[in-house]
Amino acid sequence: MKMNKYKIIAICGKSASGKDTLLHMIMNNTALHEIVSCTTRPPREGEVDGVNYFFMTLEDFAHKDCMGEMLEVSHFRDWYYGTAIDGLDVDKINVGVFNPEGIVSLMRDDRVELYVVLVQASDKCRLIRSLKREVNPDVDEIVRRYLTDKEDFELFSQIYEPDYTLDTEGVGFSYLEEAARDIVLDAIRHWAEETN
């Protein structure tokens, strides 16, 4: 008997590259299922439990992981992030944002049909976005993210070539809307070719 696999469009990119904007553009297609990740980190200002993340205690997260209820888990600083299996829909295309470690875990999971989208923009563009998106930006945190991204994505590029690469620098919403449609259609074609 053939097992149904989770079809996942995994969006990946450095900080302030436009991952969340692309996710929202893709999610305008109601036939898709948005993945809401779990995390042990505390919510940031304005984040809502169950919308931005499922905020969990370390104990609850570890229990879910030990019970085999997490599809992928990654560790960053003192926090854990992951995708709960019960947060996926086997009958729909699932779409979410993942870090390189999460992508590698998904690549190794035979329950998943993966389509990876790499979102990129120049360091200058990302820095300007980082400074503009917060009222009082934490410059130390921005620098830390940039250094971490540099290391993570250098390693990632050596082991995986994305299915789709999108440069978001200097583009408008209409371009992103068109790219979002193209990504979904290309992912569907990709999976159809794999089954033939």
What is each PLM-predicted segment?
Residues 95-99, 109-132:
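Conserved phosphate-donor/acceptor-positioning beta-strand/loop module used by diverse small-molecule
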Residues 11:
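Hydrophobic anchor at the beta1->P-loop junction of P-loop NTPases
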Residues 17:
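ATP-binding Walker
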Residues 39-94, 98:
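ATP-dependent small-molecule kinase phosphotransfer cores
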Residues 20:
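Walker A/P-loop
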Residues 28-36:
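Post-Walker A helix-loop "phosphate-sensing" segment adjacent to the P-loop in P-loop NTPases
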Residues 14:
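P-loop (Walker A) phosphate-binding loop of NTP-binding proteins
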Residues 136-195:
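Small-molecule kinase domains that catalyze NTP-dependent phosphoryl transfer to phosphate-bearing small molecules
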